[in-house]
A protein has these predicted regions:
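Compact, glycine/acidic-enriched structural inserts
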Residues: 112-158
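Short, hydrophobic/aromatic alpha-helical segments in well-folded domains
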Residues: 20-21, 37-40, 93, 117, ...
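Contiguous, amphipathic alpha-helical segments that mediate oligomerization or scaffolding
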Residues: 17-62
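Pyridoxal 5′-phosphate
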Residues: 1-11
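Short, intrinsically disordered, low-complexity segments enriched in Ser/Thr and Pro
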Residues: 56-74, 131-134, 139-145
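Hydrophobic/aromatic-rich structural module bridging two neighboring secondary-structure elements via a short loop
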Residues: 60-102
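Acidic, low-complexity proline/glycine-rich segments
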Residues: 11-17
Length: 158
C-alpha cells in the first residue's frame, strides 16, 4: 500500500467557515438567504476546489485519477417530498481512469458528518459478478482487512 503525503499548506485544509456556512444554511435553506450568501459560498467553493485538486495530486502518486467532480449545491427536488433547494454538504468524487480501472474515492464535508469513502458505487451486474468470482478464487486480502482489530471494533465480525 502506498502512503500519500501532502504539503502543509492552505490548499490541504478546509476553511472553517465552510462548516459555519453549512450550519447557517441548514437553518436557512431557502433561496432568499442563499442569494445574500452567494458570494461567500463561491469563495468557499473555490477553496474546496483547490483542496480537491491538491488531494488529486496526492492520489495520483498512488493511483490513476482521471477526473475530480465537485457536486453542485443545488438539490434536484422534482421527485422529493423534501423541497429544500440546497444540499448542506460538499461532495467530492475522484474517478479512476476508465475502462481499465473501476471504483473511486469520495469526500463528504459537512458540519457533523464528514467522511471519506472508497470503492465501487453501484456496480453493473457484470462487474458485480466479477467481484464475486474474484472473492471466490482468493478472498485472503479481504479477510486480512476485516480481521484487523480496528475493523472489528468499528464494524463487528462479518
Amino acid at each position: 500500500m502506498n502512503t500519500i503525503f501532502f504539503d502543509n499548506n492552505s490548499t490541504t485544509k478546509i476553511d472553517p467557515d465552510v462548516f459555519t456556512f453549512y450550519k447557517e444554511l441548514t437553518k436557512n435553506n431557502n433561496r432568499n438567504w442563499f442569494e445574500h450568501q452567494k458570494e461567500r459560498f463561491k469563495k468557499l467553493e473555490l477553496g474546496v476546489k483547490k483542496f480537491a485538486e491538491n488531494i488529486k495530486l496526492g492520489l495520483d502518486t498512488a493511483d490513476d485519477i482521471e477526473k475530480v467532480k465537485l457536486f453542485r449545491i443545488y438539490r434536484d427536488v422534482r421527485f422529493s417530498k423534501d423541497k429544500t433547494p440546497y444540499k448542506t454538504h460538499f461532495g467530492i468524487a475522484f474517478h479512476r481512469k476508465k475502462p481499465e480501472l473501476r471504483g473511486g474515492y469520495y469526500i463528504h464535508i459537512s458540519p457533523n458528518n464528514n467522511f471519506i469513502a472508497s470503492g465501487f458505487w453501484d456496480p453493473s451486474p457484470s462487474d458485480l459478478l466479477r467481484i464475486r468470482k474474484e472473492l471466490e478464487i482468493d478472498a485472503q486480502e479481504l479477510i486480512d482487512i476485516i480481521d484487523v482489530s480496528q475493523f472489528k471494533k468499528k464494524w463487528g465480525h462479518l
